[in-house]
């Protein structure tokens, strides 16, 4: 559906008020517009009243029936915000809705993975059917077909909900109750029903605990999970989340957007304002988190004196009591005492959206809480590679729930880091193979968290004189989740909550790094700095680097170019993927296959097997810039000296990978394992944009003892060239990680003056790299790389780059210290096509 059309439907524009261009896009057909109105309303589960669909579709009941059918067919979450209509009007409870969905997928013999993540989680909560139970049910269903008395899927499904968790602050509403229903109720149940019908909705905590569950199981009541404007929500590590698939419907997209944006110190109204999303939608999403048990309300949600005696020993109430400790509270309860509990806990869809409070008016309980509640944090940015390592390694029994939270929520907040660190501490080294790689990442992640979190040495000069300096809290943020927000929203979220961003290094090529001027970012300034282009930029400015050939998509090679003929191993990077080292002997077929899907960078890596790589951390200490060149004193290398003059390495951290292609180290080993882009010889050879062939992965021993390095033969400066420069804190090597963290503290990178210098140098580098990339685009004149372009040109180029890092329009070769256009001995695919036409 057209974005403009969606906008006008969302804002209830009738046909006669539509702009001419929108009418034209609909073929000037009012009937077409009305059809789009109904479709949009059903897809977004809009309420009939107060929306445009009311004026288009006259039959309200028919509309809700179609909405329910669409939701069920597309395996969407039950529309809890429409519970009053669904339960009272259509008599469809969440239990009957999910029973129908489960019956449909069983009859279609679909796998459990066909259920979207949140739908699967709600099915597990209400029906008690998870992956293993579903497989068991399908086996029973299939086996029954072989016998005379065949059981249908409906026969095998539960007839009533499993025991669900109900919080004391949830609101009990009367469902569709007939006289016959009342006859099968016990006396306490009848009294409860009478109270709800006569006095209106009741807090579940004010009724008998067992009666509430009994009435819910019978389908006589439904539950509202009320969220008010000033509610604050905490998201602990996920339990009971089902990782199946992402569907992409409106509500699921909203749930993921809010997941990564929410924090314990921002109330719902403020969050809606930051995200620029309708307040009622945000409340619906937060209500769903609480219903599924993925989040809980902070602060006083019910007066404990109002609790029915049957709730005293309920675990959720005991947890509630612990949250009422004033020292643990971050927000005051002022203003809530004058309202009745049910008014405070009014329906999530009907809460007044104009009751947003000024954050400045929200006083905290103590000065310590004030400091904690309003202190901006450091954000450590990671990608999905890290969560995969933590999930796949079976490193610690309870580590997986944290890893799932990091992946699905997209954030692990400072409040959860204590338990996360305890789990990381339990990780035991296996000492071999791929599992050792997972262990190394877990260990270095723990060290990095301990270094960045509440480290008073990092911010010694920025602390206020009248406040104790505890350093900054730390949140872990997944880049892919942040990129799910539009750039403006992402910027608002980051600016509101964080004082500094620090990236892991390297970030995978398969994502666009987060770009940020404020808060400052110790990491790639723009996506181009984390791409193939930056490699070529480094080679261009230093005049040094391995022989490299960047081929545009569609190019076809008849033979391997001459510059690679003497190499035994090549480093191959297909566009948007991480690199892999492959033998020269069988590379041509794979290259041509990859070139049909994407641009490819080919680089010489080793003349006698795999080349040797050494990672040189920066910023450089004074002692590292003195003395003679050796394997352990690479800071004096001429290329690094030039690089320090052209790129600000003193206010950023990271490492430069140096390559010795002629090295003949004896202690190499072959393995089918691989490391990430930080060590190209350990790089993953992921398939090339759908190609069935993937690059073979060959690895050398990741760590070479320093003494061994020094005695393994003489080396000269000429043997070594820069291969790659990565900004951020590396996680793939414990030794490198320790060195970089030490340098961050020693050079004061997180202090105010350094960050100010970083802002200027990052902008300058961004301008230079974008200008460099632009000079090799089709139709662009070759610009002087050494000139300083205007800031407006940066903006214009960045806007184009928002669609992705620009692809090469020309084939480029780096040879003998010079980067130039490559015509090649064999004609490109375009030229071949022209030859056939002649």
UniProtKB/Swiss-Prot annotation:
<keyword id="KW-0968">Cytoplasmic vesicle</keyword>
<dbReference type="GO" id="GO:0006886">
    <property type="term" value="P:intracellular protein transport"/>
</dbReference>
<feature type="modified residue" description="Phosphoserine">
    <location>
        <position position="828"/>
    </location>
</feature>
<feature type="region of interest" description="Disordered">
    <location>
        <begin position="334"/>
        <end position="367"/>
    </location>
</feature>
<dbReference type="Pfam" id="PF14647">
    <property type="entry name" value="FAM91_N"/>
</dbReference>
<comment type="similarity">
    <text>Belongs to the FAM91 family.</text>
</comment>
<feature type="modified residue" description="Phosphoserine">
    <location>
        <position position="340"/>
    </location>
</feature>
<keyword id="KW-0333">Golgi apparatus</keyword>
<dbReference type="InterPro" id="IPR028091">
    <property type="entry name" value="FAM91_N_dom"/>
</dbReference>
<keyword id="KW-0597">Phosphoprotein</keyword>
<feature type="modified residue" description="Phosphoserine">
    <location>
        <position position="671"/>
    </location>
</feature>
<dbReference type="InterPro" id="IPR028097">
    <property type="entry name" value="FAM91_C_dom"/>
</dbReference>
<dbReference type="GO" id="GO:0099041">
    <property type="term" value="P:vesicle tethering to Golgi"/>
</dbReference>
<feature type="compositionally biased region" description="Basic and acidic residues">
    <location>
        <begin position="670"/>
        <end position="680"/>
    </location>
</feature>
<dbReference type="GO" id="GO:0005802">
    <property type="term" value="C:trans-Golgi network"/>
</dbReference>
<dbReference type="GO" id="GO:0031410">
    <property type="term" value="C:cytoplasmic vesicle"/>
</dbReference>
<protein>
    <recommendedName>
        <fullName>Protein FAM91A1</fullName>
    </recommendedName>
</protein>
<comment type="function">
    <text>As component of the WDR11 complex acts together with TBC1D23 to facilitate the golgin-mediated capture of vesicles generated using AP-1.</text>
</comment>
<dbReference type="Pfam" id="PF14648">
    <property type="entry name" value="FAM91_C"/>
</dbReference>
<comment type="subunit">
    <text>Component of the complex WDR11 composed of C17orf75, FAM91A1 and WDR11; FAM91A1 and WDR11 are required for proper location of the complex. Interacts with golgins GOLGA1 and GOLGA4 and with TBC1D23; interaction with golgins may be mediated by TBC1D23 and interaction with TBC1D23 recruits TBC1D23 to AP-1-derived vesicles.</text>
</comment>
<feature type="compositionally biased region" description="Polar residues">
    <location>
        <begin position="340"/>
        <end position="367"/>
    </location>
</feature>
<dbReference type="InterPro" id="IPR039199">
    <property type="entry name" value="FAM91"/>
</dbReference>
<feature type="modified residue" description="Phosphoserine">
    <location>
        <position position="332"/>
    </location>
</feature>
<feature type="region of interest" description="Disordered">
    <location>
        <begin position="670"/>
        <end position="690"/>
    </location>
</feature>
């Amino acid at each position: 559906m057209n974005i403009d059309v969606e906008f006008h439907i969302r804002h209830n524009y009738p046909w006669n008020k539509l702009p001419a261009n929108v009418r034209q896009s609909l073929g000037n057909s009012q009937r077409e517009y009305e059809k789009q109105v109904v479709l949009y309303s059903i897809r977004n589960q809009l309420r009939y009243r107060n929306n445009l669909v009311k004026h288009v579709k006259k039959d309200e009941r028919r509309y809700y029936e179609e909405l329910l059918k669409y939701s069920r067919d597309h395996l969407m979450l039950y529309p809890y915000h429409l519970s009053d209509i669904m339960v009272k009007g259509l008599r469809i409870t969440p239990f009957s809705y999910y029973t129908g969905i489960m019956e449909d997928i069983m009859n279609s013999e679909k796998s459990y993975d066909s259920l979207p993540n949140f739908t699967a989680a709600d099915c597990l909560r209400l029906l008690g059917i998870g992956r293993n139970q579903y497989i068991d049910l399908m086996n029973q269903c299939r086996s029954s077909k072989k016998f005379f008395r065949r059981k249908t899927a409906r026969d095998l499904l539960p007839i009533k909900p499993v025991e669900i968790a109900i919080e004391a602050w949830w609101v009990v509403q009367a469902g569709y109750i007939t006289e016959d229903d009342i006859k099968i109720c016990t006396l306490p149940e009848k009294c409860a029903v009478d109270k709800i019908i006569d006095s209106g909705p009741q807090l579940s905590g004010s009724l008998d605990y067992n009666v509430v569950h009994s009435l819910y199981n019978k389908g006589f009541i439904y539950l509202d999970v009320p969220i008010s404007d000033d509610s604050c929500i905490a998201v602990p590590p996920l339990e009971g989340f089902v990782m199946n698939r992402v569907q992409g419907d409106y509500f699921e997209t909203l749930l993921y957007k809010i997941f990564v944006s929410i924090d314990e110190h921002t109330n719902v109204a403020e969050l809606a304002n930051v995200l620029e999303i309708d307040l009622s939608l945000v409340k619906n999403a937060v209500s769903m988190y609480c219903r599924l048990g993925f989040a809980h309300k902070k602060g006083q949600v019910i007066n404990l004196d109002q609790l029915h005696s049957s709730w005293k020993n309920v675990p959720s109430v005991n947890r509630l009591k612990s949250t009422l400790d004033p020292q643990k509270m971050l927000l005051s309860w002022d203003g809530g005492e004058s309202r009745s509990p049910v008014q405070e806990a009014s329906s999530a869809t009907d809460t007044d959206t104009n009751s947003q409070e000024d954050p400045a008016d929200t006083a905290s309980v103590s000065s310590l809480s004030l400091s904690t509640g309003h202190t901006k944090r450091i954000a450590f940015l990671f990608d999905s590679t890290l969560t995969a390592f933590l999930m796949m390694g079976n490193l610690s029994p309870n580590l997986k729930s944290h890893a799932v939270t990091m992946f699905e929520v997209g954030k692990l907040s400072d409040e959860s880091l204590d338990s996360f660190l305890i789990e990381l501490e339990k990780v035991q080294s296996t000492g071999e193979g791929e599992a050792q790689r997972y262990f190394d990442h877990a260990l270095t992640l723990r060290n990095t968290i301990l270094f960045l979190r509440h480290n008073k040495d990092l911010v010694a000069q920025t602390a206020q004189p009248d406040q104790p300096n505890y350093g900054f809290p730390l949140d872990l943020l997944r880049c892919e989740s942040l990129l799910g927000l539009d750039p403006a929203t992402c910027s608002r979220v980051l600016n509101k909550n964080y004082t500094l961003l620090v990236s892991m290094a390297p970030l995978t090529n398969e994502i666009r790094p987060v770009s940020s001027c404020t808060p400052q970012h110790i990491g790639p300034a723009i996506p181009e700095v984390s791409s193939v282009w930056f490699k070529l930029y480094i080679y261009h400015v230093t005049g040094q680097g391995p022989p490299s050939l960047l081929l545009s998509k569609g190019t076809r090679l008849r033979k391997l170019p001459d510059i690679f003929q003497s190499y035994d191993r090549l480093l191959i990077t297909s566009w948007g993927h991480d690199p892999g080292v492959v033998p020269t002997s069988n590379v041509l077929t794979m290259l041509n296959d990859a070139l049909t899907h994407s641009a490819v960078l080919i680089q010489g890596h080793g003349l006698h097997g795999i080349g040797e790589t050494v990672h040189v951390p920066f910023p450089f200490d004074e002692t590292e810039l003195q003395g003679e060149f050796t394997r352990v004193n690479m800071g004096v290398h001429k290329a690094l000296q030039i690089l320090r003059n052209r790129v600000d390495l003193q206010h950023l951290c990271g490492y430069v990978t140096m390559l010795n292609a002629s090295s003949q180290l004896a202690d190499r080993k072959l393995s089918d394992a691989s490391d990430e882009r930080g060590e190209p010889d350990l790089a993953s050879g992921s398939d090339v944009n759908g190609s069935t062939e993937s690059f073979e992965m060959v690895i050398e021993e990741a760590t070479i003892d320093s003494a061994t390095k020094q005695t393994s033969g003489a080396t000269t400066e000429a043997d070594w060239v820069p291969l790659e420069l990565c900004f951020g804190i590396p996680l793939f090597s414990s030794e490198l990680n320790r060195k970089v963290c030490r340098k961050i503290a020693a050079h004061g990178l997180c202090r105010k003056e350094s960050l100010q210098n970083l802002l200027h140098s990052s902008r300058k580098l961004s301008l230079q790299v974008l200008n460099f990339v632009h000079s090799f685009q089709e139709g662009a004149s070759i610009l002087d790389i050494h000139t300083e372009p205007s800031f407006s040109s940066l903006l214009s180029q960045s806007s184009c780059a928002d669609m992705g890092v620009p692809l090469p329009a020309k084939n480029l070769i780096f040879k003998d210290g010079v980067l130039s256009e490559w015509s090649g001995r064999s004609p490109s695919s375009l030229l071949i096509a022209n030859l056939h036409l002649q």
